[in-house]
């Protein structure tokens, strides 16, 4: 018990120093009175809350009795009420124990008074009345010194020396107030059945505690004269030593940390009176001090200054109110990193005392402030009943004076006789922990003017001290380090000569600093706040080599106004700055991205990558440019930061190893990433203190990449040359709509307009091509499905970036799809203008193609490289000189790295030099300029043919005649080659492309179906019939295809003869062949597969379409369909697994040369967001689907109907709509969002009217109607 400790410790003084014991006992009694009043208040409050809770719980219980027992929520509510009742009972029991403790303390206090009265009856003090002891039943206690006014005057202590929480008043007054409070508490206890009503237990830190580490040694002060009828006994030296030993022992028996005292004070702050008495923080005594005497005796002054009693207590009340405000402000600034030493100034006419100064401690002072409170009624009663103010003189010793920092506002300067203080040395800025700041003794001048002057000066100094909190400029310096990127920054310790002296800053009036820091941004200099920073790291060079930082400090401190002048900043780096208070306060952080940078078996070694956006508030908006900070930290570093970074209650905790299990590494990684992201996002969004902001910047300052926000492309560029929507192919996702911006040789793309940029495409040294399925540039792409083949994608184009160390392979190839051919041409014109070296569309950068990857080209290749063909971006004619003066070799081309797809052609070079033969130059000179055909981007059509006889000459021509001038000949470029050329024939025939085949026995049907751009090097060449037309102009070259050319189905049908095979045929041809066997209107493979699956009830097979079947069986069935076209799976003698048939259906759909939705993809993307909520959009969607070709519509209708049957049994087969979309979205090359939208709106889209508009036959219409009937069966 704390009270028992008080009694035992007080007993140490009983045998040697009775007067001091009386004072101590009365002080403790005042504290007991306060704690009685406080406990009574808590008792009333908790009893009221307990009654309300009990009443509420009874009402709830009664209401629950009348409710039906069938309700499931009854048990939960009853259990909640029971818990509330248990909580209330527990609270009552614990407060009952608290009252028992208080009753015990009252008895101990009574026994202590009896012992003290017995001791006083035997002392040698003369008294006007005989001493009498107070009985335990008495309500008041009178001291023998009360009527004689023999109580000594004790001066009030300084702000850090008085440990008690109440004023030192006379014994009678104190006993009266004590008896009043105790009797009130007893009466309250009589009216309240404490045993019947138990209270909530308060925490240990709210229990009443008394301070034991108290310094109570006094010096006697005697006034010469015969007016002192009573003198205190003189203690012997042995008694002094014993008392001193007992006090030292009392210190060791009780100690309370500052943090626990702060918690106690925070809990009681709501219940304390504003008129709190804080004798531990008084800055001046109340009355005039008596002369000091070297003896440690106490002299009693019987004279009472009754005339000044009212003024005296008025000063007490003013001081109390001032101290209450100071305490509130002082707590907020208690953790200030700055510290100032106060110089002692002695004015003339005042003699200094003969003892040393007292040592103060901010730590002990804060602890004392927790016990400084006395209720207002006690103070008023003391003011009305006391007869003599108490004055206490302090003895100069180091008893109970711990070493700590002294806040500047707690120690006002005392006037002395010394001259003005000398300059404070720089060593005082960083004192050692053992240094003990000094405090002048308590003494004032004789006149009231000096008293008021000191009071005013003290308050001004105090207010100016905590009005602003300066940060030492030498703490943190953010600057760039020398590195490869030259953007890494960290903390660099500045030179000693560049650091400021904190004491010099302390001498400057803070009001001047406040005025300078509150200037508007418009009044700042050209460099703004950066001019007020200290010199930065030694990596930056100063503007003047003769200018030294020390002279700046001298110049700033010698200002006549007393304020610090802005220093000349050595600001030579855009991304370097010094930490400043205003900069720290107004910086705002936003966590943009958190990702796992590296994995490790050790939890603390896991790396995390952070991307933080740094902006400034309105105060620094004109001086700060938004930046992006990227840095990597390990889990160990983050946890150590979280341990030292104290947040409020309710903040998200930092993840620990106990959070994670061994279930799934993917889930664990995502949980770790989200937990860390949540923790730091809370830190960046909460309102941090200045010290917390400094710690946060220190955490962010190590090895951090700083870039301006617009350099990181998180925001779309302004004033773009061209912008619009394009479809972009993404691996495993298909075509995705993106919004593109073209500016400064960079193509930015975002999800929507004005949304954050997702990525960039650099056009410098890039290859730009119109889409062609045979371009070898696609050999490095290997997606799981195929698309963009044939004439249906004439609006597509491809950009291949220059490969670097960080970007290689498929990351450099971008397939883009415009709305139509005109949109494609406009984008290509804009892109060609951005290519370096091209000043206009007439001088556009050439397209380049790597031809060595084509089948059959390796046998003809030599050391030369592919040709760069020149394309035009507009329709204006090209002059002869412009074509002949083109320097092809001046435009570098990126080199494709060897890959597994082009391993056999890795030795080919990618840069070629174009040379014109004399025959070509002569032919071009003979043709008039107006008859030259433009090299249009979208008008080139190529054909493929192989020369099986010679296999040595490649011929390039244009299949389209010039309709405007049919009689003119098309000029032909001839390129030097090591191969012999064919004989030239009549040049009036159309030009065709002939390619020799290196394999005569290849399978045409398989190669036709798999001639896709990403898998082209894996396929063998197809057998084509040699064209017998000999009227073809000859061009000698080692390449075979222009990148600006595309395939056309119409001319190919005239010259290419295919073998029979259903896989890979266009959809309309496959339907025409299927009509020989059934009238379903579907390809025969689709019809047989769906028929088999539905007859075998595949919808009840778990994992249908998700599990793979036998690859050999699927290949065998594919050959059966290719050879005989129709293969009845149900009537076959062999039984097939449903997963095999499902795999066969997916294989056929994957090999379709065109997309089912064809050109309707763009319109569906526009309708996608509005379809679920807008009937008009749904009607427009039906209209778009109804305009599909009949074959596409019928296949899409049957397939979606079949998949809806699969989804209807999702509980059995585990294939919900999401899983079905995951499987068929890449198979059909339809985005999953659109595919899901088609499935969900199937009933609204595929109606009989829509089928009739597609021109379906009557039989097929009836079949489809039957399908709808089945659909109604399952939905």
Swiss-Prot record:
GO MF terms held by the record: GTPase activator activity; lipid binding
Keyword Phosphoprotein: yes
Compartment annotation: Nucleus
Region (Disordered): 118-146, 213-238, 280-306, 335-365, 390-466, 539-561, 957-988, 1254-1275
Domain Rho-GAP as annotated: residue spans: 1065-1275
Biased composition range(s): Acidic residues: 1260-1275
Residues modified as Phosphoserine: 388
Record site: Arginine finger: 1106
Keyword Nucleus on entry: yes
Annotated Polar residues bias: 122-143, 290-299, 353-364, 450-466, 552-561
Compositional bias (Basic and acidic residues): 957-971
GO cellular component, one term: mitotic actomyosin contractile ring
The PH domain, residue ranges: 719-836
PROSITE patterns recorded: PH_DOMAIN (PS50003), RHOGAP (PS50238)
One GO BP annotation of this record: regulation of fungal-type cell wall (1->3)-alpha-glucan biosynthetic process
Keywords: GTPase activation, Nucleus, Phosphoprotein
Described function: GTPase-activating protein for Rho-type proteins.
Name of this chain's protein: Probable Rho-type GTPase-activating protein 2
Organism: Schizosaccharomyces pombe (strain 972 / ATCC 24843)
Gene: rga2
């Amino acid at each position: 018990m704390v009270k028992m400790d008080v009694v035992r410790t007080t007993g140490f003084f009983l045998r040697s120093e009775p007067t001091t014991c009386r004072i101590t006992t009365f002080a403790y009694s005042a504290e007991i009175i306060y704690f009685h009043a406080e406990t009574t208040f808590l008792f009333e409050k908790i009893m009221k809350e307990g009654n309300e809770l009990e009443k509420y719980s009874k009402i709830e219980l009664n209401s629950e009795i009348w409710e039906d027992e069938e309700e499931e929520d009854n048990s939960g509510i009853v259990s909640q009420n029971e818990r509330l009742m248990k909580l209330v009972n527990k609270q009552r029991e614990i407060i009952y124990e608290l009252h028992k403790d208080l009753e015990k303390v009252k008895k101990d206090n009574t026994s202590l008074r009896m012992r003290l009265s017995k001791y006083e009856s035997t002392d040698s003090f003369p008294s006007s009345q005989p001493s009498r002891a107070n009985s335990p039943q008495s309500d008041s206690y009178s001291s023998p010194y009360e009527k004689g006014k023999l109580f000594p005057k004790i001066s009030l202590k300084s702000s850090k020396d008085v440990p008690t929480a109440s004023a030192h008043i006379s014994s009678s007054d104190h006993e009266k107030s004590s008896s009043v409070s105790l009797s009130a508490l007893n009466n309250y206890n009589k009216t309240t059945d404490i045993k019947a009503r138990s209270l909530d237990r308060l925490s240990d830190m709210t229990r009443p505690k008394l301070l034991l580490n108290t310094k109570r040694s006094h010096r006697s002060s005697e006034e010469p004269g015969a007016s002192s009828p009573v003198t205190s006994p003189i203690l012997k030296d042995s008694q002094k030593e014993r008392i001193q030993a007992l006090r030292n022992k009392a210190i060791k028996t009780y100690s309370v940390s500052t943090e626990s005292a702060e918690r106690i004070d925070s809990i009681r702050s709501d219940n304390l009176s504003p008129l709190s008495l804080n004798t531990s923080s008084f800055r001046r005594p109340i009355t005039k001090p008596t002369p000091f005497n070297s003896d440690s005796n106490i002299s009693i002054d019987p004279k009472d200054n009754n005339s000044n009693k009212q003024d005296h207590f008025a000063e007490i009340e003013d001081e109390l109110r001032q101290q209450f405000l100071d305490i509130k402000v002082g707590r907020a600034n208690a953790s200030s990193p700055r510290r100032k030493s106060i110089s002692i100034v002695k004015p003339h006419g005042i003699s200094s005392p003969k003892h040393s100064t007292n040592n103060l401690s901010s730590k002990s002072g804060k602890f004392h402030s927790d016990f400084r409170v006395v209720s207002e009624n006690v103070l008023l009663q003391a003011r009305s009943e006391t007869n003599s103010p108490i004055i206490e003189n302090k003895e100069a010793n180091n008893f109970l004076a711990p070493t700590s920092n002294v806040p500047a506002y707690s120690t006002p300067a005392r006037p002395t006789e010394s001259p003005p203080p000398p300059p404070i040395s720089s060593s005082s800025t960083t004192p050692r922990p053992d240094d003990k700041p000094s405090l002048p003794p308590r003494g004032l001048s004789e006149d009231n003017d000096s008293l008021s002057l000191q009071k005013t000066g003290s308050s001004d100094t105090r207010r100016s001290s905590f009005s602003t909190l300066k940060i030492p400029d030498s703490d943190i310096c953010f600057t760039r380090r020398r590195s490869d990127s030259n953007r890494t920054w960290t903390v660099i310790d500045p030179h000693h000569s560049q650091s400021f002296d904190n004491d010099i800053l302390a001498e400057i009036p803070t009001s001047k600093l406040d005025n300078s820091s509150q200037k508007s941004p418009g009044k700042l200099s050209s460099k703004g706040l950066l001019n007020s920073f200290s010199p930065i790291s030694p990596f930056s060079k100063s503007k003047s080599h003769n200018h030294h930082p020390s002279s700046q400090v001298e110049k700033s401190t010698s200002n006549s106004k007393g304020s610090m002048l802005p220093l000349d900043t050595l600001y030579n780096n855009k991304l370097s700055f010094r930490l400043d208070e205003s900069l720290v306060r107004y910086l705002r952080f936003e966590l943009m991205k958190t990702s796992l940078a590296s994995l490790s078996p050790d939890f603390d070694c896991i790396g995390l990558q952070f991307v933080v956006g740094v902006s400034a508030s309105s105060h620094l908006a004109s001086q700060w440019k938004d930046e992006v900070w990227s840095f990597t930290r390990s889990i160990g570093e983050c946890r150590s930061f979280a341990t030292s970074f104290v947040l409020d209650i309710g903040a998200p905790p930092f993840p620990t190893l106990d959070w994670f299990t061994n279930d799934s590494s993917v889930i664990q990684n995502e949980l770790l990433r989200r937990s860390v992201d949540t923790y730091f996002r809370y830190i960046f969004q909460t309102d941090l203190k200045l010290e917390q902001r400094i710690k946060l910047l220190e955490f962010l300052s190590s090895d951090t990449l700083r870039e301006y926000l617009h350099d990181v492309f998180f925001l779309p560029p302004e004033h773009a040359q061209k912008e619009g929507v394009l479809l972009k192919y993404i691996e495993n996702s298909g075509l995705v709509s993106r919004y593109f911006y073209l500016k400064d040789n960079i193509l930015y793309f975002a999800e929507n307009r004005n949304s954050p940029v997702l990525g960039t495409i650099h056009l410098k040294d890039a290859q730009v091509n119109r889409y062609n399925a045979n371009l070898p540039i696609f050999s490095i792409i290997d997606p799981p499905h195929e698309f963009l083949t044939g004439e249906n994608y004439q609006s597509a184009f491809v950009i291949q970036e220059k490969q670097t160390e960080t970007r290689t392979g498929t990351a450099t190839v971008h397939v883009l799809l415009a709305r139509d051919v005109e949109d494609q041409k406009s984008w290509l014109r804009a892109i060609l203008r951005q290519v370096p070296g091209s000043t206009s569309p007439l001088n556009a950068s050439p397209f380049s193609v790597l031809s060595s990857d084509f089948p059959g080209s390796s046998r003809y290749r030599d050391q030369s490289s592919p040709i760069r063909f020149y394309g035009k971006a507009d329709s204006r004619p090209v002059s002869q000189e412009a074509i002949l003066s083109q320097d092809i070799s001046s435009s570098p081309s990126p080199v494709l790295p060897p890959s597994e797809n082009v391993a056999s052609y890795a030795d080919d070079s990618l840069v070629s030099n174009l040379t014109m033969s004399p025959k070509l130059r002569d032919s071009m000179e003979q043709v008039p300029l107006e008859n030259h055909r433009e090299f249009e981007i979208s008008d080139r059509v190529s054909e493929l043919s192989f020369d099986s006889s010679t296999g040595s000459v490649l011929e390039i021509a244009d299949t389209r005649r010039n309709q405007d001038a049919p009689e003119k000949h098309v000029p032909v470029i001839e390129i030097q080659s090591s191969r012999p050329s064919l004989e030239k024939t009549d040049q009036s025939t159309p030009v065709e492309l002939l390619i020799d085949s290196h394999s005569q026995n290849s399978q045409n049907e398989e190669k036709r179906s798999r001639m896709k751009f990403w898998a082209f090097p894996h396929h063998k060449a197809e057998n084509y019939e040699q064209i017998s037309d000999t009227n073809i102009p000859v061009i000698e070259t080692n390449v075979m295809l222009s990148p600006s050319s595309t395939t056309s189905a119409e001319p190919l049908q005239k010259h290419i003869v295919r073998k029979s095979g259903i896989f890979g045929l266009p959809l309309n041809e496959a339907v025409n062949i299927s009509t020989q066997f059934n009238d379903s209107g579907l390809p025969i493979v689709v019809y047989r597969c769906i028929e088999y699956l539905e007859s075998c009830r595949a919808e009840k097979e778990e994992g249908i379409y998700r599990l793979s079947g036998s690859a050999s069986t699927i290949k065998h069935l594919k050959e059966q369909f290719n050879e005989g076209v129709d293969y009845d799976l149900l009537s076959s003698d062999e039984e097939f697994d449903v997963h095999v048939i499902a795999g066969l259906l997916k294989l056929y759909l994957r090999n379709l040369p065109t997309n089912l939705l064809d050109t309707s993809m763009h319109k569906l993307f526009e309708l996608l967001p509005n379809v679920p909520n807008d009937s008009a959009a749904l009607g427009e969607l039906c209209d778009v689907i109804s305009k599909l070709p009949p074959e596409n519509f019928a296949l899409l209708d049957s397939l979606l109907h079949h998949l809806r049957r699969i989804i209807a049994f999702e509980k059995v087969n585990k294939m919900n709509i999401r899983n079905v979309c995951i499987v068929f979205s890449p198979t059909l090359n339809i985005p999953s969002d659109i595919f899901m939208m088609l499935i969900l709106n199937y009933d609204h889209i595929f109606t009989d009217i829509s089928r009739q508009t597609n021109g379906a036959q009557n039989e097929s219409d009836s079949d489809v109607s039957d399908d709808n009937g089945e659909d109604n069966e399952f939905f």
